[in-house]
Amino acid sequence: MQFQQLTYFVAVAEARHFTRAAEEVHVSQPSLSQQIRALENELGAELFSRARGNITLTDAGEALLPLARRILADADTARHEVQELAQLRRGRVRLGATPSVCTGLLPEVLRAFHDLHPGIQLLLEEGGSHDLVRELARGALDLALVVLPLPAASPALTTVELLQEDLVVVSSAQRPRPGRGGRVRIADLEGEPLVMFRHGYDLRELTVAACRAEGFEPSFTVEGGEMDAVLGFVRAGLGIAVVPHMVAARSGADLRATPLARPGLRRTIALAHRSDVAPPRAARELQRVVLGPV
């Protein structure tokens, strides 16, 4: 049974005339009759009574007509839905990003994407790179903005480096600036009260590793927060924190950012997706927008 045969059948049923039905569907009358006969043979029943030139539906034809209309309507709906997705008028993208990227980079990128494709729904998951890599691996995300290098046990992922960002030390504007000469050495953090991110957070691991490389264990006054919480605790004067420059630049006048002395700390942000699964069309378009300036 073919969609074309059902289309011809519905046309004849509505016109009650083979020639007029053939004109309606833009096919020759013999071809239409041949397809109707093939459909009847496949179903094992006559669909039309052709007595004395009058075309009427048989019981089998009456039973098939509403089903055929529904099948054709569903096919048309499916065709429209697929075309909408293919032309990026509808769809969704599941994007993961670290909190600092959500704060610093994504607002402008997502605004640009939304302006281009307002019908595409953006589902954002915020988390550390370890969590995002795990979500990519199980198919819960289409794309993720992660920090390189990836965890050693990461599944096969394709990554494209997006940017490198410097880390800075943020402190309350009400307390003395840390360090000397307008810059902070990692060694200057020894004994300083640090507001620290939760375990599994890339910035925590990077900061702790840098302190240990200088021969000391960092001292935490508060630990376990996400980006917004950490900045809030710093504003309240509970300590200082090491954060990306793009976050500090947007944190307001009540926070003061001090650069780290050379060589400083930097991290690389990359856009990742699974290597074994091609991202959906909408995700590929977001990928193009994200990587546009690269």
List the predicted regions and their residue ranges.
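Secondary-structure junction motif
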Residues: V147, R177-R185, P193-E214, P279-Q287, ...
